[in-house]
């Protein structure tokens, strides 16, 4: 069983998995490492690291700005692996998922990417702009090094595609709770419930819900139906807001993470 799968398997029935997202290299690589430590101390079961990219089309303004900062600072995919490897020196239980876009992986090369990800301690990969129908080659390579391949499901995803995803996805399904980009405002819990039930009829994987979860209240509501709660824009916004005061940044991120993880477990 993979480390990512074990996170869900070992989680008590009524305790939901908490998956915070931060952008790797935002405010510095050392800062990312410290943020990862703070998130774990405050209840993170899985950490999603955003891989810097110049054209993050699926992301809203908060996360897009974080990518702009990291691209400007020259943060590379190799830098992301370095941070994960450092994290693994003291933590062998928290799962790490890389979330990003296809171009940096293609430039790196599928097999070198998979090898470097595995060697650093990455557990899962989510490629936002890679259609499942075109993902089989990368899936085979990731399977070969024991890395889960995670896919997005949107409210607009057709049943036929769900059937196909059941044959290719692993780790968990990332359900996009809103039509739009990350950080969007309105969360329709009835829509979330309906689509989670629809996904469960076809795909036998845990379901994490992201987009639109901003605080402990929205996290609690979503956790009634999902297996995992994914929070990104609110945390990345704190990193941006307190970029000039690392102590306060770490405290604010830790407080929000603790508030969310406590209420869903």
Swiss-Prot record:
Cysteine-cysteine disulfides: none
Listed PROSITE patterns: TRP_SYNTHASE_ALPHA
Protein keywords: Amino-acid biosynthesis, Aromatic amino acid biosynthesis, Lyase, Tryptophan biosynthesis
CDD domains named in the record: Tryptophan_synthase_alpha
Metabolic or biological pathway: Amino-acid biosynthesis; L-tryptophan biosynthesis; L-tryptophan from chorismate: step 5/5
EC main group: lyase
Protein name: Tryptophan synthase alpha chain
Species, as recorded: Vesicomyosocius okutanii subsp. Calyptogena okutanii (strain HA)
Taxonomic classification: Bacteria, Pseudomonadati, Pseudomonadota, Gammaproteobacteria, Candidatus Pseudothioglobaceae
Gene name for this UniProt entry: trpA
């Amino acid at each position: 069983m993979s480390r990512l799968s074990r996170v869900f398997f070992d989680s008590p029935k009524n305790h939901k998995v908490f998956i915070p997202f931060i952008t790797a290299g935002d405010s510095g690589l050392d800062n990312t490492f410290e943020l990862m430590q703070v998130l774990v101390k405050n209840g993170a079961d899985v950490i999603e690291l955003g891989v810097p990219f110049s054209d993050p089309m699926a992301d809203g303004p908060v996360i897009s700005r974080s990518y702009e900062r990291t691209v400007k600072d020259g943060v590379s995919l190799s830098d992301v692996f370095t941070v994960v490897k450092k994290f693994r020196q003291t933590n062998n239980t928290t799962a790490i998922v890389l979330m990003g876009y296809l171009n940096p992986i293609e430039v790196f090369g599928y097999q070198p990417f998979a090898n470097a990800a595995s060697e650093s301690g990455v557990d899962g990969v989510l490629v936002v702009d890679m259609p499942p129908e075109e993902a089989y080659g990368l899936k085979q390579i990731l399977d070969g090094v024991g890395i889960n391949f995670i896919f997005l499901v949107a409210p607009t995803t057709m049943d036929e595609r769900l059937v196909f995803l059941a044959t290719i996805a692993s780790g968990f399904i990332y359900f996009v709770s809103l039509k739009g980009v990350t950080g969007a405002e309105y969360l329709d819990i009835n829509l979330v419930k309906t689509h989670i039930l629809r996904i469960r009829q076809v795909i036998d994987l845990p379901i994490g819900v992201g987009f639109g979860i901003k605080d402990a209240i929205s996290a609690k509501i979503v956790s009634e139906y999902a297996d995992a709660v994914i929070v990104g824009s609110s945390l990345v916004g704190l990193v941006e807001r307190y970029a000039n005061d690392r102590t306060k940044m770490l405290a604010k991120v830790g407080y929000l993470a603790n508030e969310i993880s406590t209420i869903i477990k």
